[in-house]
C-alpha cells in the first residue's frame, strides 16, 4: 500500500497530471510492501496482483458552475491509456471547496505493461486543483488486494 500526492496547485487541466507527484512523507505515514514508482505521471506497480486504486481530488472554482472530469486511466500494453474510472464533478458556487473521488480495481498481470495515470479535465475555466507538500489534498492510494 502506498499514497502519492500532488505537491502544488494547478489551474484548469491536468490531462494527464504529469508533474509534482511525491510519495507521501508526512510524519507517521506508513506503507505496506513495496511502493509504486512514478515517472512523468505514469505509475508502475511493484508486483503483479489485484490493486485497488483510489483518486481523491480537491478543487475550488472562481466562477459559478465549475465542471470537472476526474479519471483513473490504465494501460495493459504500456502505451495506449484509456479511462478505467471517471467522475463528472460540478462546483455549484464560486470559492466553494470540493472533494471528488473515483476508484478502480486493476488486475496487473504484467508490471512492464500494466500502468496507470490520473486526469483532471476542466470543462469550465477558472478551476484550481489543490496540492500540498506536507498533507494529502489531491492524492492517489494504491492497495494490493491479492494475487492475480
Region spans (language model):
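Terminal (often C-terminal
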Residues: 1-66, 72-76, 125-148
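Positively charged, low-complexity intrinsically disordered regions
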Residues: 4-6, 72, 88, 94, ...
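Generic detector of N-terminal low-structure segments
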Residues: 12, 83, 106-108, 120, ...
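N-terminal start-of-chain detector that recognizes signal peptides
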Residues: 24-25, 87-90, 112-117
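A short linear-motif detector with a strong N-terminal bias
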Residues: 31-32, 48, 82-85, 94-96, ...
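A short, structured loop/turn motif at beta-sheet edges
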Residues: 47-48, 73-80, 107-115
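Extracellular beta-strand-rich recognition modules
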Residues: 49-59, 99-103, 113-121
Amino acid at each position: 500500500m502506498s499514497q502519492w500526492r500532488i505537491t502544488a496547485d494547478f489551474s484548469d487541466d491536468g490531462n494527464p497530471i504529469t508533474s509534482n507527484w511525491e510519495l507521501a512523507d508526512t510524519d507517521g505515514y506508513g506503507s505496506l510492501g513495496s511502493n509504486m514508482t512514478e515517472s512523468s505521471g505514469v505509475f508502475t506497480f511493484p508486483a503483479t496482483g489485484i490493486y485497488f486504486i483510489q483518486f481523491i481530488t480537491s478543487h475550488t472554482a472562481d466562477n459559478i458552475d465549475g465542471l470537472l472530469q476526474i479519471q483513473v486511466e490504465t494501460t495493459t500494453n504500456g502505451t495506449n491509456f484509456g479511462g478505467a474510472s471517471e467522475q463528472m464533478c460540478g462546483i455549484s458556487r464560486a470559492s466553494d471547496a470540493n472533494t471528488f473521488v473515483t476508484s478502480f480495481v486493476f488486475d496487473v498481470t504484467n508490471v512492464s505493461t500494466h500502468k496507470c495515470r490520473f486526469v483532471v479535465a476542466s470543462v469550465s475555466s477558472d478551476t484550481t486543483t489543490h496540492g500540498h507538500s506536507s498533507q494529502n489534498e489531491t492524492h492517489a492510494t494504491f492497495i494490493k488486494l491479492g494475487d492475480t
